[in-house]
């Protein structure tokens, strides 16, 4: 059962990481459509790197943002968060591959594999949180400008990349929780069957036990020698 949970969590994190990469490269983070009397005359869509426009004739033009310093602060922060999420996801994917019980990469012991799997789960949870913050922050700015009556610029709507990003972050977090919680649940279980192991009393080494016996014997002798003399012996 524990092995199945680990494999399921690893699969979720791998799919989540792939979807995060697609989200970062997706062109439609926000979309604006200009409608004419009969047909759609112009469609503008942007992501974190460039802006594109498509007219009614199907002509497609894209241009990159001129300078990183000229961008809004939240776009720069979203870039950093998404790149951090993908790097954490790749590191977690590698550690998870090594830490799975069903793999024999590196020939590690079970205890080390469990720790690596837990570390991989924590990294995937952090990656999902970073991606979730980036996507949600970007969506917040879109909705704020859209419903602001004083905003004179182009009003955009949420693009499909944001929904893809939310799904990717959710998969990464769920997979990371499976890997991390599986480490906590496997401490007192049989690694092969997943059955709860019976309680074992702590074993006291023979050397420490022998060191304790003379001290206890001397205490008993002192008590017995003191007991030989009662109150009447001093009268």
Swiss-Prot record:
Site entry (Important for Na(+)-selective paracellular ion transport), positions: 55, 64
Entry keywords, A to Z: Cell junction, Cell membrane, Disulfide bond, Ion transport, Lipoprotein, Membrane, Palmitate, Phosphoprotein, Tight junction, Transmembrane, Transmembrane helix, Transport
Listed transmembrane segments: 2-24, 75-99, 116-140, 160-182
One annotated GO biological process: bicellular tight junction assembly
The reaction(s) this protein catalyses: Na(+)(in) = Na(+)(out); K(+)(in) = K(+)(out); Cs(+)(in) = Cs(+)(out); Rb(+)(in) = Rb(+)(out)
Recorded GO CC terms: bicellular tight junction; plasma membrane; tight junction
Cytoplasmic topological intervals: 1, 100-115, 183-235
Residue intervals annotated with topology Extracellular: 25-74, 141-159
One term of GO molecular function: structural molecule activity
Positions bearing Phosphoserine: 111, 218, 225
Region (Important for the formation of tight-junction strand-like structures) residue spans: 146-147
Modification after translation: Palmitoylated.
Cellular compartments annotated: Cell junction, Tight junction; Cell membrane
Function: Forms paracellular channels: polymerizes in tight junction strands with cation- and water-selective channels through the strands, conveying epithelial permeability in a process known as paracellular tight junction permeability. In intestinal epithelium, allows for sodium and water fluxes from the peritoneal side to the lumen of the intestine to regulate nutrient absorption and intestinal morphogenesis.
Family listed: Belongs to the claudin family.
Protein's name in the database: Claudin-15
The species this protein was found in: Bos taurus (Bovine)
Gene designation per UniProt: CLDN15
